[in-house]
Amino acid sequence: MLAFLGGTGPEGRGLALRLALAGERVVIGSRDAERAGKVAEDLLQQVPGGRIEGAANADAAARADVVFLTFPYEGQRALLEQLQEPLIGKVVVNVIA
C-alpha cells in the first residue's frame, strides 16, 4: 500500500490518482481523517474499482509500505517526529522541494 501524507492537497491527490489508475492500492492521509475520506471518495469516482482509502496521517503511515510526504516542508519536521514509530522500516519519499 502507498500512503500520501497531506494527501488532500494537489500534489497528494494527483500522485494518488495516477498510481491508483495504475492499479496501486493507496491511502490518503490527512490531519483530518474525515477530510481524507472525502478526498478518497472523490478520487474513487475517477478510478472505478480503484483501491483508495482515507485515514488520519498516523494510520496511513502505519498501514503503508511506501509513504509519500506531500505537504509543505515547513510542517514536515513536526509530523515526522510524531510518526517516528510508524515510519520505521518504510520507504519515505519527499515530493516537496
Describe each model-derived feature in a short phrase.
Residues 93-97:
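Glycine-/Pro-rich loop/turn segments that contact NAD(P) or position catalytic residues
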Residues 1-42:
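NAD(P)+-binding Rossmann beta1-loop-alpha1 motif at the extreme N-terminus of oxidoreductases
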